Amino acid sequence: MIIVDESGSMCAIRQQAFSGMNETLQTIKICAEQNPDLEQYVTLITFDSNHTNFHYNNAEGMAVVPLKESDYRPGGCTPLYDAIGSGIAKVNAQTQDGDSVLVTIITDGYENASREYDLKMVKNLVEKLTEQHWTFTFIGTDDLDVEGMASSMGIRHTLSFARNEEQADAMFKEERECRMCFYNEMIEPTASADVTYFKKKHV
């Protein structure tokens, strides 16, 4: 599951976020095509205070296609907890015991508009599911306390990036590389696998 902030402040890196999502979808599709025995499903969410869009909801990895320009138009505030909570609830209802789930959260702002979920509820969900083969990663701009935000939600894998085009591009590239390592580890587990999802904390 990929959860991407679509609030107004993302306008500054809108094109990089849009391109990065499509490149990530392509990475997922390629991995699914190369490993047909590894069942992969994709849920892609973008959110602001006016909507939560499920662009993909448990779609087969080989079936995903790029988003259209009109699918990502930043505006509004940042109901971060609602997006995470509702996404987790939906994906959790679609998984079975033993399934591995990778959750990637990307934002450039603090929570400021949630109505259904609060921090405690999100943290409880994250901590419970981390014990059940779920991996949570949190990516934020370097003007945020990224590690503090993630820790408060029970997430330990973090990455931060500067709010500019070059660093946003580098962030998505780093995420895709780490995603491929994650997939490869699922296909061929190694005793020496690094327990840290991201190779580095900053890009």
What residues fall within each predicted segment?
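Acidic, low-complexity intrinsically disordered regions
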Residues: 1-203
